[in-house]
């Protein structure tokens, strides 16, 4: 094992010990990187590109739990649902009629916590209404995902992570708060993240 991989495994083990799960974002990874972490015992992997999701589910072990974390186009719902276990980036109620055709799919509601018009996600003021629609369609929803703008200040991220955690705490049947990436996972964990999304950090962990 090289030092980068050893350090990454230590990081993952420490997160597990603290009660935080990790979805390994393999967007920029070679197939060999995926298998290296698979062989170390990790099973949650995230893809944002549909073609790669399809290709990798075809060549990797079937016990990998694939998460889709990219933008969702209506015409791609079938492809995503056939190859992923969880969609972390659900952000449009108009997708529900197609999602209900795939009873095994699970979703997380992506929150547009910044409220910026150019950001994906459900606005905070619309969350309750969207949850009602999800329940009407009998879609399995496990919680929320949030991804604040990367150029946000630490203080701004603290505020947004805190606000997201308060929203999460209102829904006691939800178990997953996907919050924190390679850039800000430590901060997100201070505010109650249960799932981090780490990619490049694990390949460059000196």
Predicted feature descriptions by range:
Residues 1-183, 191:
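Conserved alpha/beta-domain cores
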Residues 72, 204-206:
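Conserved catalytic cores of soluble enzyme domains
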Residues 46, 196-197:
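Paired acidic/hydrophobic, glycine-rich loop segments that form the ligand-binding mouth/hinge
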Residues 189-190, 197-204:
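Expand to "…catalyze enediolate/carbanion chemistry for C-C bond making/breaking, isomerization
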């Amino acid at each position: 094992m090289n030092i980068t991989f050893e350090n990454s495994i230590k990081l993952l083990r420490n997160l597990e010990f603290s009660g935080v799960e990790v979805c390994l974002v393999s967007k920029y990874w070679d197939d060999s990187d995926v298998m290296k972490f698979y062989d170390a015992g990790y099973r949650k992997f995230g893809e944002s590109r549909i073609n790669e999701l399809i290709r990798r589910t075809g060549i990797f072990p079937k016990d990998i739990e694939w998460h889709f974390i990219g933008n969702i186009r209506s015409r791609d719902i079938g492809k995503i649902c056939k190859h992923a276990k969880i969609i972390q980036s659900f952000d449009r109620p108009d997708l529900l009629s197609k999602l209900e055709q795939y009873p095994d799919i699970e979703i997380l509601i992506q929150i547009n916590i910044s409220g910026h018009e150019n950001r994906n996600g459900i606005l905070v003021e619309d969350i309750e209404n969207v949850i009602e629609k999800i329940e009407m369609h009998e879609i399995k929803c496990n919680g929320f995902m949030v991804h604040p703008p990367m150029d946000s200040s630490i203080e701004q991220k603290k505020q947004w992570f805190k606000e997201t955690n308060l929203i999460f705490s209102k829904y006691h049947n939800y178990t997953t708060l996907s919050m924190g990436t390679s850039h800000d996972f430590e901060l997100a964990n201070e505010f109650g993240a249960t799932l981090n999304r780490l990619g490049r950090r694990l390949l460059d962990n000196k």
